[in-house]
């Protein structure tokens, strides 16, 4: 916030319009696709990577065995996806927009995480209003304690 830099996520500052699109896509739980050996992807509720051996990767492509290149690491349960959305969203200084959560999961995060939010609010680590759940200045300094509630 000095010299025109904006504190837009827990560990980054930028000039307006120069925020990391990659990081923000991760914090917003957007899907991404990785191409090539050792590349990672996230689609719907599945995280996977491609095999790391470049020669094996190329051989599978040449033989038309593309599925042999993919390794599934995790298929998330909905409750895990909801918790992750909170954890990642709280990395952003703007926090989690309640209506965005409702649109994605058709649930109210204030009700769904009422116990966690009450505890964190009582400890002055988060602020909750009608539109947003976000870290307080104290919560920014102690963010790991906040995120632990959603792991």
Give residue spans per PLM region:
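Minor-groove-contacting beta-hairpin "wing" of winged helix-turn-helix DNA-binding domains
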Residues: 132-136
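Short amphipathic alpha-helical interaction segments
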Residues: 106-121
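A short, conserved structural fragment
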Residues: 121-131
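Short secondary-structure transition/capping segments
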Residues: 19-23, 123-124, 141
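C-terminal scaffold of the Radical SAM
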Residues: 1-107
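Short, amphipathic alpha-helical interaction segments positioned at domain boundaries
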Residues: 138-151
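Short secondary-structure boundary/hinge segments and terminal tails
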Residues: 16-18, 120, 137-138
């Amino acid at each position: 916030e000095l010299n025109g830099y904006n504190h837009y996520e827990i560990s980054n500052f930028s000039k307006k319009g120069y925020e990391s699109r990659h990081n923000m896509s991760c914090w917003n739980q957007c899907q991404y696709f990785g191409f090539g050996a050792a590349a990672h992807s996230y689609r719907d509720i599945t995280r996977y990577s491609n095999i790391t051996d470049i020669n094996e990767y190329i051989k599978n492509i040449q033989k038309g065995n593309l599925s042999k290149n993919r390794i599934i690491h995790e298929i998330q349960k909905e409750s895990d996806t909801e918790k992750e959305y909170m954890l990642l969203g709280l990395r952003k200084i703007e926090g989690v927009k309640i209506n965005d959560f409702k649109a994605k999961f058709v649930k109210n995060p204030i009700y769904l995480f009422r116990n966690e939010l009450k505890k964190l609010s009582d400890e002055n680590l988060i602020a909750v209003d009608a539109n947003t759940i976000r870290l307080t200045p104290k919560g920014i300094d102690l963010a790991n304690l906040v995120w632990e509630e959603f792991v």
